[in-house]
Curated annotation (Swiss-Prot):
Record-stated family: Belongs to the DNA mismatch repair MutS family.
Domain of life: Bacteria
Gene: mutS
Pfam families: MutS_I, MutS_II, MutS_III, MutS_IV, MutS_V
Protein species of origin: Protochlamydia amoebophila (strain UWE25)
Name recorded for this polypeptide: DNA mismatch repair protein MutS
Length: 858
């Protein structure tokens, strides 16, 4: 993304060389230059009739990126796209990381003499797309602002498509990074100084996904300016009512972001009607690597939801519910009472399955009312958007009545917020036809009888022959001339024709228009008026419908706050129904959640793997951790035996439990976990000059420096990225640190290949050995995937190599070398560290034989 910004700046430096000699440039191009100056580094789409045109470097860029023809007019490079198909082209550019400024004709060319006025009406960028194929129904599209005041980081993030606006503050850059990884903002706003000082933050995030960064001068984040902008926007006297008292950094970020969107990007922000603050301490902390390693929302394999925790538990019926479930997965709760409320709601729904079935069918009728309402408020809504909103609210009253029959305080509380908004719905249904056109002017939008003049114009436009027949009958009766005819031609328009022998019967108010050989043609004021109506009917229909629709949209927009309250309540209920269905489908049970210090799981299962491998019976496993004798479970066993699956399984069950979900286990009792850390596998970070081992140690250091006695730590194969002795030493000391360091005594699952670490159980209180059971028969093994108590001194590496398909010659030689090592190294006495009570530093006995040298001695 930074390369993209540099590319644009280079284009602009060339562009600035163009002279603006007014004597040599047309008025229209002067207008273009003014718009381009306002657009800045964005590609300018300049409206000219039915096309958007791009000039100079923008034209070159458009031609290259969209493979369009590049032409010239008076030596000015230009390229254009049709107005009606522009959305697809804009989406392609935004997907490539560009910003697109839209300069529209703000006057009607038919009513304007001379040059039509044009202005930049909006700027489209990754974080500001509103009606685009780039948007995912299941994910938010956040635009974030970052500032730092003293030692405090301020974060504000906004989804223009839903109206969600949040702020928070952080004291540690690592905490901020974890939160940004959770949010995945599509675009950032910050100061030049912040971007330069915290470049590593953006660089680290870019390892995961692409985004756009915009910078402003420092003064544009000044507190008083940001504070006043928010006060004026929300029309309040103080920000305390939003919970922002004393949050200087957050206010600076929030005010600067809204100001930037309105003043620089020309975006409507009137639909942003509230701002909410939160603290990351309200939720379980899941750092960046934990979210990634546990595949909470994105698969490591292809980045999709498939084979992730979210993919399993998200069975929501509405887009609002899907987006909320995404947040629930990444923000497990810490308050026991809140978890119990969700649990009780799930149990109540399970007890009323017939109601759940009805609710699901009703929820299918509900569209994305959150985003529909934002389009209404921002004046982007089409007739179809309004009718979709109408049909989405039709089942709300019935949904509410069903929910109020379920004995759950949590469900009833949210059901009460389901206002069917009958007046709003009547506004829409009384005005709009059930199947309106996609856009105004492309067909009938308003109902018959809604507007008298509109009905008359439609009748004129679509039924002129019938009108002429009726009028002819009327005039014949008035004049008594039975042969009188009413006709029309393009040259003279409408006329009344009578034969010459009937001329004396014509009334005085008839006006002679044309004389023919055998007849006379007349017009009347009524016929003249009708002719005028017919000739301008379509234009007038479009004008009236536009006025009516604009007024209707404003009236519906007045219900924005009410609609969003309904949307949020529906989303929460949708999520709870989803968790209910998952619990029923996969036989989950309700865990006991409290503030105790134990973590007990009986017959736990991996929530994702058991759904993927339905053809195999999943082997359940138990877990027992506490803050006394079972603080660290040391798990040994071969690769492919199921250690990593078990580690992830425990972490995922804990996360599910604190979401408020039931869990895949026979029983579970979980004391609140404040943070989950995982160190599972490593990938070389060569782009940043970091080896596998450096990444491993950096992540381990983060865990040791931030874990608490309430945390859950998952460590898989610590120390494997270096030599054997270094690896054993580091793994031992890490385990010992977690067992003995006050305030860091986290509940820990520690999987390792180093059988030497099993000695920890004898030497340090709190360590308990477990291993993955293996069945041996002759020279073959079977992985039982069962975690059992006790250590093991066998790695079965050669057996795993056989399963992987290594040549037999390699396997035979490996076996010879292994026997040689075991014979000569006396491995069982090679590593027996002892702890010094004073220094808590391990002392290691030097091995009697050098493994590596001995291997090559003959």
């Amino acid at each position: 993304m930074f390369i993209f910004q540099l590319k644009i700046s280079l284009f602009m430096s060339d562009f600035e060389q163009h002279s603006l000699d007014e004597s040599k440039i047309s008025p229209m191009m002067m207008q273009w230059h003014a718009c381009k100056k306002m657009a800045g580094d964005a590609i300018l789409f300049f409206r000219m009739g039915d096309f958007y045109e791009a000039f100079y470097e923008d034209a070159h860029l458009l031609s290259k990126e969209l493979e369009l023809t590049l032409t010239k007019r008076q030596e000015i490079p230009m390229s254009g796209i049709p107005f009606h198909t522009s959305e697809g082209y804009i989406d392609k550019l935004v997907a490539k990381g560009f910003r697109v400024a839209i300069a529209e004709q703000i006057e009607d060319p038919k009513k304007t003499k001379g040059l039509v006025k044009r202005e930049v009406v909006r700027v489209v960028s990754p974080g500001t797309v509103i009606n685009s194929s780039l948007l995912s129904d299941k994910n938010n599209n956040f635009f974030a602002a970052l500032v730092k005041v003293g030692q405090i980081f301020g974060l504000a993030f906004l989804d223009l498509t839903t109206g969600e606006y949040w702020v928070s503050e952080f004291t540690q850059e690592r905490e901020l990074l974890n939160e940004l990884y959770r949010l995945h903002p599509a675009e950032f706003l910050t100061s030049e100084k912040f971007k330069e000082k915290h470049a590593s933050l953006f660089e680290e995030m870019q390892q995961t996904y692409s985004f756009l960064v915009n910078t402003l001068e420092d003064w544009q984040f000044e507190h008083q300016q940001a504070h006043d902008f928010l006060i004026n926007h929300f029309k309040v006297q103080r920000l305390d009512g939003f919970g922002l008292s004393g949050m200087v950094a957050a206010i600076n970020a929030a005010g600067a972001l809204l100001n930037y969107l309105q003043e620089t990007l020309c975006l409507p922000i009137q639909h942003i009607q509230s701002i909410r603050c939160y603290s990351s301490s309200q939720f379980m902390m899941l750092d960046r690597m934990t979210q990634r390693n546990l595949e909470l929302t994105h698969s490591l394999q292809d980045g999709s939801r498939r084979h992730t925790l979210l993919g399993v538990i998200d069975q929501t019926q509405t887009p609002m519910g899907a987006r909320l479930m995404h947040h629930w997965v990444k923000q497990p709760l810490l308050k026991v009472s809140e978890i119990h409320q969700r649990q009780n709601g799930i149990q109540a729904l399970l007890n009323h399955e017939h109601i759940v079935d009805q609710l699901q069918n009703l929820f299918l009728q509900i569209k994305d009312i959150e985003r529909l309402m934002m389009k209404v408020s921002a004046c982007y809504a089409t007739p179809r958007d309004l009718i979709a909103l109408h049909f989405s609210f039709k089942p709300i009253a019935f949904i509410k009545s069903l929910l109020l029959n379920i004995p759950s305080e949590w469900i009833n509380e949210h059901a009460q917020k389901l206002d069917p908004l009958s007046k709003m719905n009547a506004l829409i249904s009384n005005a709009i036809v059930e199947e309106p056109p996609l856009r105004l002017g492309e067909g009938k939008t308003f109902r018959q009888g809604f507007h008298r003049e509109l009905d008359e114009l439609r009748e004129i436009s679509h039924d002129s022959k019938a009108w002429m027949a009726r009028y002819q009958t009327q005039i014949r009766e008035e004049t008594g001339i039975k042969t009188l005819k009413v006709g029309f031609n393009k040259m003279f328009g409408y006329f009344i024709e009578v034969s010459r022998g009937q001329i004396d019967k014509m009334p005085d108010h008839f006006i002679r228009r044309q004389t023919l050989v055998n007849a006379e043609r007349y017009i009347t004021p009524e016929l003249k008026e009708y002719e005028s109506k017919v000739l301008t009917a379509e234009e007038r229909i479009n004008s009236i419908e536009s006025e009516l629709f604009h007024q209707l949209r404003l009236e519906v927009a007045s219900y924005t706050k009410n609609v969003l309250e309904v949307a949020q309540a529906l989303a929460k209920i949708d999520c709870l129904i989803s968790l209910t269905n998952v619990a029923k489908k996969y036989c989950y049970t309700c865990p006991v959640i409290d503030d105790s210090s134990i973590l007990v799981i009986e017959e736990g299962r991996h929530p994702v793997i058991e759904t993927v491998c339905r053809h195999e019976k999943f082997i359940p496993n138990d877990t027992y951790l506490d803050d006394q004798a079972n603080r660290l479970l040391l798990i040994t066993g071969p690769n492919m035996a199921g250690k990593s699956t078990y580690l992830r399984q425990v972490a995922l069950i804990v996360i599910l439990a604190q979401i408020g979900s039931f869990v895949p286990a026979a029983k579970a009792h979980i004391g609140i976990i404040d943070k989950v850390f995982t160190r599972i596998g490593a990938s070389d970070d060569l782009s940043r000059g970091q080896s596998t081992f450096m990444v491993e140690m950096t992540e381990t250091a983060n865990i040791l420096n931030n874990a608490t006695s309430q945390s859950l730590v998952i460590l898989d194969e610590i120390g494997r990225g270096t030599s054997t002795y270094d690896g054993i030493s580091i793994a031992w000391s890490v385990a010992e640190y977690l067992l003995t360091t006050e305030k860091r005594m986290a509940k820990t699952l520690f999987a390792t290949h180093y059988w030497e670490l099993t000695k920890l159980e004898e030497k340090v209180p709190g360590a308990v050995n477990y291993n993955v059971a293996v069945h041996e028969a002759d020279d073959h093994i079977t992985f039982l995937r069962k975690i059992i108590k006790g250590g093991t001194d066998k790695s079965y590496g050669i057996h795993v190599a056989r399963l992987a398909g290594l040549p037999q010659a390699v396997l035979n030689r490996s076996k010879e070398i292994l026997e040689h090592l075991e014979e000569n190294a006396n491995r069982k006495s090679a590593f027996e560290p002892t702890r010094s009570k004073k220094s808590m530093v391990s002392k290691v006995k030097v091995p009697s034989t050098d493994f590596q040298l001995n291997l090559f001695q003959s």
